[in-house]
Design a protein with these regions (language model features):
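Catalytic metal-binding/acid-base residues of hydrolase active sites
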Residues: 13, 126, 156-157, 206, ...
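Active-site gating loops and adjacent loop-to-helix segments of metal-dependent hydrolytic enzymes
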Residues: 4, 13-42, 158-179, 216-240
């Protein structure tokens, strides 16, 4: 019987305790993303630890993938660093990149890595409707590439959500499509060839990407598709196969993903504390029962995680947690 004993959760969120004014801003963001449920729960370390202990999770990488400006990113990252410093054997953090301001984003990447000891970085799938193939992101990707840094990509609402969501919350469907939207945009710009040292991890198994990548590879190179960089079907598959995939609420996508990439590109995450406990329990059960990964491959998930997040491995070794 499989168990999660000692696994690293690369997808969890440390939502802060908010003032009334901050909660109003948060609620505005939730409304813009068509969240119709309650606001995100405030994160409490002891409650998170109880969840982790109940499910065999050794450590969570905390992140806040909000589309914020530099000052807010600094606050988020300082808070994440403080949590990780207080319990370095149980929590790490991924620094928020203020992608709306590329030059200041580079400064924050440097500060978070060199001064705060971030285990990696996090960014949203788009910034005000601008996707990863846009030159807007070039300074950010160049700095991540220079550092051989991991970056966790979390879905966000697309521009024009009010026209496409059919009145439903963004996470129900539109988030699922925003990940392949930005990744495909990056592929046609040859982003992953231009920045080969950047390790990109896609949340939720890449959303709809496991279902659509072969269609993109088949149709993308056809003459009626805009393709100024002459990306071929092999180019598309090669770039996509180099990505990493975190599987929160996407256990049934493991099999299709293994037609694209290899088992060492599959990572574990929960999306805690979002959704509700039944969603977490069902997902973990489905992943443990999945036959897509054999026992050896499943047992190697942590080794894959530490290969993607080497700073985490070094820190855990320093505190005697590995």
């Amino acid at each position: 019987v499989r168990r999660l004993d000692g696994i690293v959760d690369v997808h969890s969120h440390n939502f802060p305790v908010l003032s009334a004014a901050q909660r109003e801003v948060e609620n505005s963001w939730l409304a813009a993303n068509r969240f119709t449920g309650p606001p995100a729960p405030e994160w409490v370390a002891d409650v998170a630890l109880a969840f982790m202990d109940a499910h065999g999770i050794a450590l969570q990488l905390l992140s806040m993938p909000t589309d914020v400006f530099a000052e807010r990113a600094r606050e988020i990252n300082d808070r994440g660093a403080a949590v990780a410093a207080a319990k370095p054997d149980r929590f790490g953090f991924l620094a928020t990149i203020p992608a709306a301001e590329p030059r200041r984003a580079v400064d924050e990447i440097r500060r978070a890595a060199d001064e705060l000891g971030a285990d990696g970085f996090v960014m949203s799938t788009n910034t005000g409707g601008t996707y990863f193939g846009d030159p807007h992101y070039a300074p950010i990707f160049a700095e991540l590439d220079r550092r051989h840094a991991p970056v966790f990509v979390h879905p966000s609402a697309p521009a024009g959500l009010e026209l496409t969501a059919c009145g439903r919350p963004g996470p129900v469907l539109e988030f699922v499509f925003d990940t392949p939207r930005t990744v495909v945009d990056a592929v046609f710009a040859r982003v992953f060839e231009n920045y080969p040292n950047m390790k990109m991890v896609l949340a939720h198994g890449g959303g709809a990407l496991p279902a659509v990548w072969s269609r993109v590879a088949a149709l993308g190179p056809l003459p009626w598709v805009p393709n100024p960089r002459a990306v071929t079907a092999d180019d598309i598959k090669t770039q996509l196969a180099g990505l990493y995939f975190e599987m929160a609420n996407a256990a049934h996508s493991v099999g299709p993903l293994l037609e694209l990439t290899t088992a060492d590109h599959i990572l574990f995450g929960t999306d805690y504390p979002l959704s509700d406990m039944k969603v977490h329990e069902d997902y973990i059960r489905d992943l443990l029962n999945s036959t897509a990964l054999d026992d050896t491959q499943f047992a190697a998930i942590n080794a894959s995680t530490l290969a993607v997040f080497p700073e985490l491995g070094r820190r855990l070794s320093a505190v005697g947690a590995t």
